[in-house]
Amino acid sequence: MASSMISSPAVTTVNRAGAGTVAPFTGLKSMAGFPTRKTNNDIASIASNGGRVQCMQVWPTTGKKKFETLSYLPDLDDAQLAKEVEYLLRKGWIPCLEFELEHGFVYREHHRSPGYYDGRYWTMWKLPMFGCTDASQVLKELQEAKTAYPNAFIRIIGFDNVRQVQCISFIAYKPPSF
């Protein structure tokens, strides 16, 4: 019996993945670990008269001018203003005061589409209060601005210098005629 060994050259190619390639899609994971129904034990979501809800009446939509963020609420007193300023300081935002002598409300003189950018330009009161940690400092500046411009609208804004955006803005003082 003769045995013979035949050797043949085998060529293999290696396909190395490049640094920028992504593994192929292998399919969706099982949904067994996720709940299919979310239960809510909040009393506000129960459809019954079991809980009493207190709602604040908002101002009428006609005949009232729209100001900034909290314009649908009654004017804020000093304690409420202090709480708003403390909130923006807790968030790490930089407080700044701005005033407007003519139009503290929304109007469409230079731009016809709705939104924040509607042609209103406010003047900054001093510089932004970088490093401010106390709401009383902001309220002191507000009193100075009210004394200097008693017929102006004055608002407090909170600026996030990391994201470079204005995060909060509300009217802190309206002229006596409004």
From Swiss-Prot:
Transit peptide feature, positions: 1-54
GO terms (BP aspect): photorespiration; reductive pentose-phosphate cycle
Primary subcellular site in the record, as a coarse category: plastid
Keyword terms of this UniProt record: Calvin cycle, Carbon dioxide fixation, Chloroplast, Photorespiration, Photosynthesis, Plastid, Transit peptide
Source taxon at top rank: Eukaryota
KW Chloroplast (keyword) present: yes
GO molecular function terms attached to this record: ribulose-bisphosphate carboxylase activity
Intrachain disulfide bonds: none
UniProt xrefs under CDD domains: RuBisCO_small (cd03527)
Comment field (misc): The basic functional RuBisCO is composed of a large chain homodimer in a 'head-to-tail' conformation. In form I RuBisCO this homodimer is arranged in a barrel-like tetramer with the small subunits forming a tetrameric 'cap' on each end of the 'barrel'.
Role played: RuBisCO catalyzes two reactions: the carboxylation of D-ribulose 1,5-bisphosphate, the primary event in carbon dioxide fixation, as well as the oxidative fragmentation of the pentose substrate. Both reactions occur simultaneously and in competition at the same active site. Although the small subunit is not catalytic it is essential for maximal activity.
Family listed: Belongs to the RuBisCO small chain family.
Protein name as it appears in the record: Ribulose bisphosphate carboxylase small subunit, chloroplastic
Native species: Glycine tabacina
